[in-house]
C-alpha cells in the first residue's frame, strides 16, 4: 500500500458552513476494540498524532465525489470530508466502507441520496478540482467571466476554488488569446471586461497563476490587458514604455540566459505592482502579498546568481576602477552596483553578510573612493547610496578599511575625507546629499556601534585616527567662515567682540549648521577627544561668532553646541568659558533680540535656567558678576533674579562657614584647602594627559603659547595667588573670574592681637597653649614654616614675600628642631 495513495487532508464543516482544514495525514481502516467495529484512522504525517478516528457506521450515508473525495455526517452538525491525493487511495477506502455497509463499491452514495444543500455546502471546500464550472472562454462570455472573478474575491475559499479551476484548464492563455482578438477588432467593451478579469486574477494571490501570467510568453499581454482601465478615457501605454523607453543595459555581458530572463521578469513585475495596479484598499491589502513574495524571491535569486559568478563581478570591479573606462560606462557600472546593493536588502541576514563580505573582498571600498571623487553628479549620488548600504551593514568594516588606508595614503585621499569633502562641496541648494553624508559620518563616529574586544578597542583606535586625520577637514569651513581678523571693543561690557561678517549665504549657513550638528554629537559622545580639540582650536569662541548670523537656525545651532558643553557640567569646560568670557556673544544676542518672543529668546533663557537649576556655581558667579547689570531689566522670567539669589546664597554660606571656625583653625584649614586645590588641578591635568595619550596642547609643537588653555590657566592661578596675598586681610574677596575665594593669611601673632613680622616674634609671642593646644603645638608652629615650597604644608602664611624667602634660606638650620 503506497503512502501517497493513502495521503489525505481532513476537513470539518464549521459553524459558518465553511470547510476547515484539520491537517494532512495517512488514512487506514482497522478494527478498533473500543469502538467495537471497523474504523477510519488518520494519523498526521508530521508527528503521527491521531487526526481522525471514526467508526464506519452501517447506517451513515457516505458520498464519493470527484473521484478523490469522501464526505459524510457523524452528527447533526458535524460533517467530515477526506480529500485524497490519489484516486487509487480513495477507491481503496471506499471499498472498505462499502464492505462494512454491504454495498456495491460502484455506487457513489452508500445510503439514500444526500440532500442538495449538503452538496452545495461542500462546494465551498478548497483543494478539490472542478468544483466550479468556468464559462466557455469566448467573446460573448467575457462579461460573465468578469462577474464570476469579481464575485469570488470576498471569499477566501471561493478564491482558492477559482484559482484551481483556472490553473487546471489553462484558462489564462485562452483569455490572453481573446485579448489579442479584441485589440484587433477594437472591441473596447471586451477589453474593459478583460481588464477586470486579469486584475481579479492577480488578486487571487496564487503563485501558480503568477508563474503563467509572468512568463515571457504571457507577461506583455497581461500588461496590455491592464492598459484598458474602464475608469480612464484613453488606455495607458505601458507596453510602449516597457519595450521602447525602458532599456536593459548589460554593463558586462550576462552569459547566463536564465539570469537575464529573471532580471527582465523582475523588472516588469515590479512595474506592474508599482505603476499599473492601483493602490489596494484597506480590504485588499493582503490580496497582493504573494505578488510581493514573487518579486522578493526573484531578487534573492538574482543576487545569489550574480554573487556566485565571481568572474562577472571581478570584471565589473576591474572596469569600475580602470582609468581608461569612459564616464558613460563608469556611470552604468555604478548604477548597476546601486541596484545590486538595493536587491541585497531582500536577503536574509546571514546571506546579506556573505554578500557584503564578497563585495569587500573584491574591493568595493577602494572603488567607491575613486568614483566618489568624480565630477559626474549622478555617479557621485549612486556611489553615496552604495556607501550608505555598506555603512548600514557594517560600520566596523568601513572603519577598519580607513584605518588601514591611513597607514599608506595621505590625508587628502582617505575615504572618510573624500566623504567629508563631498558633503562640503554638495552643489544641491537644499544640500540633500550633504545631509545624507552627514548621517553616514555620524554613524561611523558613533561609539555605540564600535566594538571592544580583548585584543583591541575599536573606539579608541578609530577616534584617535579621526581626530588626527579627519577632524581638520570637517571643521575647515567653520574656521574659514569665523576668522577673527577684525576686533572691536564692546561698548556695553568692555569685552572683545568680533566684527566678522557672518556668512549670509543660505547654502553656506546650511552647511555650517550640518557641521555644528556633527560637532554637537561629538561633544555628547567623544568626551576627551573633542575636549582637546575645542581647547586647542578655541573652537567654542569661533562657533559663537555665528550667533551674529541673520539665519536664526544657524545661531540656534551655535547656541545648541554651547548648551551641550554646559550640559556636561564639566568644570574644565566651565573654566574655559569663564576665561574666554564666552557668555558675551550669547548675552549680546539676547539683548539684540529685544522683546521678540521667539525660539532664539527661549533657547538662550533655557541655557541660563539650566545653570540656575543645576546650581553650577562657577558659571553663576561669572554671569552675575560680569553681566547682571545688563540682564537685570529682564523681568518677564525669573531666571536672572534666580541666578542672583543663588549667587548671594553661596556668598552667605561661605561667610557663615568662615565665621563658625576659630581664626587659627580657619587659617590652618583654608590655607591647606587652597593649596590642595592647586594640587588637585595639577593632578587633573596630569590624569587627563595620561587618559588621552596626548597632551591637551603638545608642548613641542605649540607655536602660540598664549592660546594654550592649560598654560594660560597656570598664569591665571599665579595671578590669583598674587591677588590672595594682596587681599589676605579682607574677607571675602572676589577673584577676577567671579568666584569667591576665602584665603586666610593671618599670622599667629595677629590672631592673638599682636604685631609680628618674623618667625622669631611668632615663637616669642605665641602663648604656651592656644585653643586647646600645648607646648608641642608651639613647636610645630615654629618649625612648619620651614619652606613654602617644601613637602610640608605651612600652617601660617606671611604677608611679606621677602620674609618668606628669608625663612626659606633659614630652613636648613631649623630642620633639626623637627626631631627635638
From Swiss-Prot:
Q: Please name the taxonomic classification of the source.
A: Eukaryota, Metazoa, Chordata, Craniata, Vertebrata
Please state which protein family the record places this protein in. Belongs to the SMEK family.
Give the multimer and partner information. Serine/threonine-protein phosphatase 4 (PP4) occurs in different assemblies of the catalytic and one or more regulatory subunits.
Q: Where is the composition biased (Polar residues)?
A: 750-761, 768-790
Listed Basic and acidic residues bias regions: 701-712
Q: Which gene encodes it?
A: ppp4r3b-a
Gene3D superfamilies (alphabetical): Pleckstrin-homology domain (PH domain)/Phosphotyrosine-binding domain (PTB)
Question: What is its biological role?
Answer: Regulatory subunit of serine/threonine-protein phosphatase 4 (PP4).
SUPFAM superfamilies xrefs: ARM repeat, PH domain-like
Q: Which GO terms describe its molecular function?
A: protein phosphatase activator activity
Under which name does UniProt file this protein?
A: Serine/threonine-protein phosphatase 4 regulatory subunit 3-A
Region of interest: Disordered: 682-712, 750-820
Q: List the disulfide bonds.
A: none
Q: Which Pfam families match?
A: EVH1_PP4R3, PP4R3
One GO cellular-component annotation of the UniProt record comes to: nucleoplasm
Composition skew (Acidic residues), residue ranges? 682-694, 798-809
Amino acid at each position: 500500500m503506497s503512502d501517497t495513495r493513502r495521503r489525505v487532508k481532513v476537513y470539518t464543516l464549521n459553524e459558518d458552513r465553511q470547510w476547515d482544514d484539520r491537517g494532512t495525514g495517512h488514512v487506514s481502516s482497522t478494527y478498533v476494540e473500543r469502538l467495537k467495529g471497523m474504523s477510519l484512522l488518520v494519523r498526521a504525517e508530521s508527528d503521527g498524532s491521531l487526526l481522525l478516528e471514526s467508526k464506519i457506521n452501517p447506517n451513515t450515508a457516505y458520498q464519493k465525489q470527484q473521484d478523490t473525495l469522501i464526505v459524510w455526517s457523524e452528527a447533526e452538525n458535524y460533517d467530515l470530508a477526506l480529500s485524497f491525493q490519489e484516486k487509487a487511495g480513495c477507491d481503496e477506502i471506499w471499498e472498505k466502507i462499502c464492505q462494512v455497509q454491504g454495498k456495491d463499491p460502484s455506487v457513489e452514495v452508500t445510503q439514500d441520496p444526500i440532500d442538495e444543500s449538503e452538496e452545495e455546502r461542500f462546494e465551498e471546500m478548497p483543494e478539490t478540482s472542478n468544483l466550479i464550472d468556468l464559462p466557455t472562454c469566448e467573446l460573448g462570455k467575457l462579461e460573465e467571466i468578469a462577474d464570476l472573478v469579481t464575485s469570488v474575491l470576498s471569499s477566501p475559499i471561493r478564491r482558492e476554488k477559482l484559482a484551481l479551476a483556472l490553473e487546471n484548464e489553462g484558462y489564462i492563455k485562452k483569455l490572453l488569446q481573446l485579448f489579442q482578438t479584441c485589440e484587433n477588432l477594437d472591441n473596447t467593451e471586451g477589453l474593459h471586461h478583460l481588464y477586470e478579469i486579469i486584475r481579479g486574477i492577480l488578486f487571487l494571490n496564487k503563485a501558480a497563476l503568477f508563474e503563467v501570467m509572468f512568463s515571457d510568453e504571457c507577461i506583455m499581454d497581461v500588461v496590455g490587458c491592464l492598459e484598458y482601465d474602464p475608469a480612464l478615457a484613453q488606455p495607458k501605454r505601458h507596453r510602449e514604455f516597457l519595450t521602447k523607453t525602458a532599456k536593459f543595459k548589460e554593463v558586462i555581458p550576462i552569459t547566463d540566459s536564465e539570469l537575464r530572463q529573471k532580471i527582465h521578469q523582475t523588472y516588469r513585475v515590479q512595474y506592474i505592482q508599482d505603476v499599473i495596479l492601483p493602490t489596494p484598499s484597506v480590504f485588499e491589502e493582503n490580496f497582493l502579498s504573494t505578488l510581493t513574495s514573487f518579486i522578493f524571491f526573484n531578487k534573492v535569486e538574482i543576487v545569489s546568481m550574480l554573487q556566485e559568478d565571481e568572474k562577472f563581478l571581478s570584471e565589473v570591479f576591474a572596469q569600475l576602477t580602470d582609468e581608461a573606462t569612459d564616464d558613460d560606462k563608469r556611470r552604468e557600472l555604478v548604477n548597476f552596483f546601486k541596484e545590486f546593493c538595493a536587491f541585497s536588502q531582500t536577503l536574509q541576514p546571514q546571506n546579506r553578510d556573505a554578500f557584503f563580505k564578497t563585495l569587500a573582498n573584491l574591493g568595493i571600498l577602494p572603488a567607491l573612493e575613486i568614483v566618489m571623487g568624480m565630477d559626474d553628479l549622478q555617479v557621485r549620488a549612486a556611489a553615496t547610496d552604495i556607501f550608505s548600504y555598506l555603512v548600514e551593514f557594517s560600520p566596523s568594516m568601513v572603519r577598519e578599511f580607513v584605518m588601514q588606508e591611513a597607514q599608506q595614503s595621505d590625508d587628502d585621499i582617505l575615504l572618510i575625507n573624500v566623504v567629508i569633502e563631498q558633503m562640503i562641496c554638495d552643489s544641491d541648494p537644499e544640500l540633500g546629499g550633504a545631509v545624507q553624508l552627514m548621517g553616514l559620518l555620524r554613524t561611523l563616529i558613533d561609539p555605540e556601534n564600535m566594538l571592544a574586544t580583548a585584543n583591541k578597542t575599536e573606539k579608541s583606535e578609530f577616534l584617535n585616527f579621526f581626530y588626527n586625520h579627519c577632524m581638520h577637514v570637517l571643521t575647515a569651513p567653520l574656521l574659514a567662515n569665523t576668522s577673527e581678523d577684525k576686533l572691536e571693543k564692546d561698548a556695553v561690557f568692555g569685552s572683545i567682540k568680533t566684527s566678522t561678517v557672518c556668512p549670509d549665504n543660505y547654502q553656506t549657513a546650511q552647511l555650517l549648521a550640518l557641521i555644528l550638528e556633527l560637532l554637537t554629537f561629538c561633544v555628547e559622545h567623544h568626551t576627551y577627544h573633542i575636549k582637546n580639540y575645542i581647547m586647542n582650536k578655541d573652537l567654542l569662541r569661533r562657533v559663537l561668532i555665528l550667533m551674529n548670523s541673520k539665519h536664526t537656525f544657524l545661531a540656534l545651532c551655535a547656541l545648541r553646541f554651547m548648551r551641550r558643553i554646559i550640559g556636561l557640567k564639566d568644570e574644565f569646560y566651565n573654566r574655559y568659558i569663564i576665561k574666554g568670557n564666552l557668555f558675551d556673544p550669547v548675552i549680546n544676542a539676547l539683548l539684540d533680540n529685544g522683546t521678540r518672543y521667539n525660539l532664539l529668546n527661549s533657547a538662550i533663557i533655557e541655557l541660563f535656567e539650566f545653570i540656575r537649576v543645576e546650581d553650577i556655581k562657577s558659571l553663576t558667579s561669572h554671569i552675575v558678576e560680569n553681566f547682571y547689570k545688563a540682564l537685570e531689566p529682564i523681568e518677564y522670567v525669573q531666571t536672572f533674579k534666580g541666578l542672583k539669589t543663588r549667587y548671594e546664597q553661596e556668598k552667605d554660606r561661605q561667610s557663615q562657614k568662615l565665621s563658625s571656625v576659630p581664626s587659627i583653625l580657619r587659617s590652618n584649614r583654608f590655607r591647606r584647602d587652597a593649596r590642595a586645590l592647586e594640587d588637585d588641578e595639577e593632578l587633573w591635568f596630569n590624569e587627563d594627559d595620561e587618559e588621552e595619550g596626548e597632551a591637551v596642547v603638545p608642548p613641542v609643537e605649540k607655536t602660540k603659547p598664549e592660546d594654550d588653555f592649560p598654560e594660560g590657566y597656570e598664569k591665571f592661578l599665579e595671578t590669583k595667588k598674587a591677588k590672595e596675598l594682596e587681599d589676605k586681610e579682607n574677607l571675602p574677596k572676589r577673584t577676577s573670574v567671579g568666584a569667591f575665594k576665602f584665603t586666610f593669611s593671618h599670622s599667629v601673632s595677629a590672631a592673638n592681637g599682636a604685631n609680628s613680622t618674623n618667625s622669631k616674634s611668632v615663637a616669642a609671642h605665641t602663648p604656651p597653649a592656644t585653643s586647646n593646644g600645648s607646648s608641642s603645638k608651639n613647636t610645630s608652629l615654629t618649625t612648619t614654616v620651614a619652606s613654602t615650597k617644601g613637602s610640608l604644608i605651612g600652617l601660617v602664611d606671611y604677608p611679606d614675600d621677602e620674609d618668606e624667602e628669608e625663612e626659606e634660606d633659614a630652613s636648613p638650620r631649623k630642620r633639626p628642631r623637627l626631631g627635638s
